[in-house]
A protein has these predicted regions:
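Short acidic (Asp/Glu) patches
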Residues: 209
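Nucleotidyltransferase catalytic core that binds NTPs
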Residues: 1-205, 213-225, 229-239
Length: 240
């Protein structure tokens, strides 16, 4: 019997908060197979799967664990590898998404419980042929006032080059001390999110207006953490 844990999401872009949730899932379910499920859908948001995958790899997701799927909350591309009659399936989300669909524990019109059930309080865990389960893990602040990719997308076009570098080094610690790699990430984000000219002298209050403090008080100097060798050119070849 295997427990499969899937972290579904949009990941526009994948960032340090997502990585923290991924690691939280690994700690919460130490014997499970933990995956991240993402689509290639850019109809409403800007990041294609190939860029999401590069940023997830840079952040620290292991190879083979960031998987392209058609539907993140079905993730059949992942579950097809496992036995629906024996194995258990758990989806994990951040606490901040507790009120976002899909909601676990809904009673269907015919009076039967829905396929997706809350893990908390479950007396018996059924194989995923019958039910999947939802677990919520603590939300992690991954930058000054940042808890979501939406805040990154909102803040990014308002930041000057210095603050973009600072934010990238906060979101992706492996870029710290590697200016070329940081600039490659900035080019990816500029291409996906967009950019505008911002004066270097813009005040912090102007830069962070309506962005929940994104980039406020940040500098490009950080205590380096989790600095792993990364090919500085591996992000440079990409198509958007």
């Amino acid at each position: 019997m295997t427990t499969v844990v899937i972290m579904p999401g949009g990941f526009h872009p994948f960032h340090a908060g997502h990585l923290a949730l991924y690691h939280s899932a690994q700690r919460a379910f130490p014997d499970a197979e933990v995956y991240v499920a993402a689509t290639n859908d850019t109809a409403a948001r800007p990041f294609p799967f190939v860029v999401k995958e590069k940023l997830a790899k840079l952040a620290g997701v292991e190879a083979g664990h960031f998987v392209q799927v058609k539907s993140p909350f079905r993730a059949e591309e992942i579950t097809a590898q496992f036995d629906p009659q024996r194995d258990h399936l758990i989806f994990v989300r951040s606490d901040k998404d507790k009120n976002q669909p899909p909601m676990p524990g809904i009673i269907k019109k015919d009076g039967n419980p829905s396929y997706l059930q809350p893990l908390l309080g479950a007396k018996k865990i059924e194989p995923f042929s019958k039910h999947a389960y939802m677990a919520y893990l603590p939300t992690v602040e991954f930058g000054p006032g940042l808890t979501s990719a939406t805040q990154i997308r909102t803040a990014w076009p308002t930041l000057n080059s210095k603050r973009k570098t600072a934010l990238v080094m906060s979101l992706y610690p492996r870029t710290q001390g590697n200016e070329k790699l940081a600039q490659s990430v900035i080019k990816l984000l500029d291409a996906a999110i967009g950019t505008q000219d911002v004066a270097e002298t813009m005040s912090i209050s102007q830069t962070t207006a309506n962005t929940s403090g994104a980039g406020a008080g940040m500098s490009a100097s950080y205590q380096r953490r989790d600095n792993q060798p990364v090919d500085e050119d591996y992000l440079s070849e990409h198509r958007l």
